């Protein structure tokens, strides 16, 4: 057996539900999209001189990579070394990140 509900009551219930939903959505804070801030490891910082040296000594516990480690058979040979110096990277206006500094650490 199917109940017959007057159309006006159905419309009244739907209108009430719509009004309640509209009020609830206006109470909730609107979320705006914004870019995420870079993590501590990805923030670029300009470091030079003793400041850069101190940071490298703190993060490179087992020491830094020497050019002899990178180019073991280059003694006596003329070869352009394309490895960028850490000061070339960090002591310029762009600065460097923690992850980039880790490339200069051993192991």
Curated annotation (Swiss-Prot):
GO terms for cellular component: extracellular region; extracellular space. Its main location: secreted. Belongs to the insulin family. InterPro entries: Insulin-like_sf (IPR036438). One of its GO terms (biological process) is positive regulation of multicellular organism growth. GO terms for molecular function: insulin receptor binding. Residues 67-76 form a propeptide. Heterodimer of a B chain and an A chain linked by two disulfide bonds. Expressed at a low level in the larval gut. Residues 1-33 form the signal peptide. Possible ligand of InR/insulin-like receptor. This is Insulin-like peptide 6. Keywords: Cleavage on pair of basic residues, Disulfide bond, Secreted, Signal. Disulfide bonds join 48-91, 60-105, 90-96. It comes from Drosophila melanogaster (Fruit fly). It comes from the Eukaryota. It is found in: Secreted.
């Amino acid at each position: 057996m199917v109940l017959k509900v007057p159309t006006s009551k159905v419309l009244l219930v739907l209108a009430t539900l719509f009004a309640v939903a509209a009020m609830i959505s206006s109470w909730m804070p609107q979320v705006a999209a914004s870019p995420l801030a870079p993590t501590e490891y990805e923030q670029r910082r300009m470091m030079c001189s003793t400041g850069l040296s101190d940071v490298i000594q703190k993060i490179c516990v087992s020491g830094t990579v020497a050019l002899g480690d990178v180019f073991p058979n280059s003694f006596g040979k003329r070869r352009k070394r394309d490895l960028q110096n850490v000061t070339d990277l960090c002591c310029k206006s762009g600065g460097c990140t923690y992850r980039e500094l880790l490339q200069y650490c051993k192991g």
